[in-house]
Amino acid sequence: MKVSLCSLILIAGSITAVRAETSEGDGIFAQFVTNKGTIEVVLEYEKAPKTVANFITLAEGTRNRIDPNTGRLTRAPLYNGQTFYSVVNEFGFFPLPSTFYALTGSGTSSSVGGPGYAVPDEFDASLRHNGYNVSMSALANFTGTLFGPEINRGPNTNGSQIMFTGNTILTRFDDVNSIFGSVTDPASRAVVDAIIFGGAGTTTISNVTIERVGQAALDFDEHAQNLPYVGPPLGELRVEENAVHFDHDEPLGSGSFFSFRRSSDLLSWSPTTRRHIDPDFGTEPSTQLDEIAAPKAFFDMLLTRHPGGLSPATLANRTLVLNTAPPNVITYTFVFDSTGTGGTTNYSVDASDGVITSLSYVAEGYGASLQITSSNIPTPLRARLGFDSEDASNLIGRHFLEGFNDPFWSPIGSGQLTLSK
C-alpha cells in the first residue's frame, strides 16, 4: 500500500517579480513592507546561496515548514505579520561600540519558534557586520543568559530568524550570524533606524516581495541549493504478524529525523518516537513503527532531512575535545563510555581527571546540544556543537560553550571541536 502522509498545507503563490534595470544594478532584492515604511535589502545570493535560498522560500511560501504556533505543516509566507519582537538601541562609550539591531522572523513574533529545521552557517570574508546588514540568527531555544536573550544558539542553528543592524559595527557577530543581505539606500536605512529606535513590538511586517534584475539573478534557483526538507514521508506501510514497518521510497540517510506516533481512535496518541539516522550506520530503508500489529491503528509520521548532516545519534565510545579561543583559553576533553552518558573529563585548568555525573545529548540537523556536569568542573556546562566536516578519524567543527551561575547561564567561550568517530 503506497502512502503519503496528508497534512493541511496552505499553498502560497510565488510573489517573485522581475523589474526593469535600475541604477542599483543587477541583483536579487527583498522588499520588506512595514508600518514604518519599506526596506529594500540587497541579497547576497552569490556569497551566501543557501542562506538566501532559505530566506526566499520562507518569504514566498514555496517550501514546507512547521508552523511553530500549530505544529502543522504549512507553506504560508513566514514573515507576513511578524513583528520586530526585540530591539537594542544602546549608545556605546569609547572603546565600546554602539549596539543597534532588531530581530524578527521567528514565526511567533517572540524569541521561540522557527521553521522546524536548521540550515548550516555560511560565512564570507567580505561580509562583515559593518552597518545596515541583514543576517540569519538562530533562535534561542535555551533559557536566557546573564546578558539577556541569546541572539544565536551557536554554530549551524540558522532557521528563520533574521537580524537587521543599524549604523554600527558589530564585530562580535562576524562569522557567528550568517550575513545574507545589506541595506544600501538612504530611505531604507532610515526605516531600519525608525524600527530600532521605535522599540520592541512597534513594527510589523505586512509582506515581503522578491525582485530580480539581470540574467544571473533570474538564473539563481533557490530550490537547487540542497536545503533541508520537512514533510510527509513517502513509502509503503508493511503489516506483518507481529510488527508494523514503514518502508521508505528513499532510504533514510545521515541527517534524517523520522518522527511518528500511534493512535487507535485518532483521539489519543502515543508519545512521539523520534528516529535519528547515525552517519556511522549507513542508511535505514525501513523503520519499525510497532512491535505488535493491533486490529486497528493510525500512524502520524513526519520526515525531516538535513542533507550532509554529520551529527551522530549517540556519544558512546567517542572522545570530544572543546578548545576555547582567546582570551579565555581552556581545553575540555570528554571521554565517553559505552553508554554514551558517562565517562571521564580532563579540564586544562585542573590537571586532575573528573567523572561525568550527568549528561544530556540531543542530535540536531547539523550539530547537537550537550549539557554536562563533571566532578572536576566547577559549574554545569552546556554547549552547542556544530559539525562542519570530517576526516578519517574525527568530526570537525565549532562550539559555543556556557556555564551555569545560578540563576543564569553565562558565556565561557567558543572555538574549535573534534569528536572521534
Please name every model-derived segment.
Residues S4-S14:
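Bacterial N-terminal signal peptides
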Residues N323-G367:
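N-terminal glycine/threonine-rich, aromatic-flanked beta-hairpin/loop signature
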Residues F32-T38, A325-V329, D350-I356, N376-P380, ...:
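Glycine-centered tight beta-turn/hairpin loop motif at sheet-sheet or coil-to-beta transitions
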Residues F258-F260, F299:
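Short beta-strand elements bearing conserved aromatic residues within extracellular beta-rich modules
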Residues P307-I330, G397-E402:
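Tryptophan-anchored aromatic micro-motifs
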Residues V18-G255, D265-L267, D278-S286, I292-P295, ...:
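Cyclophilin-like peptidyl-prolyl cis-trans isomerases
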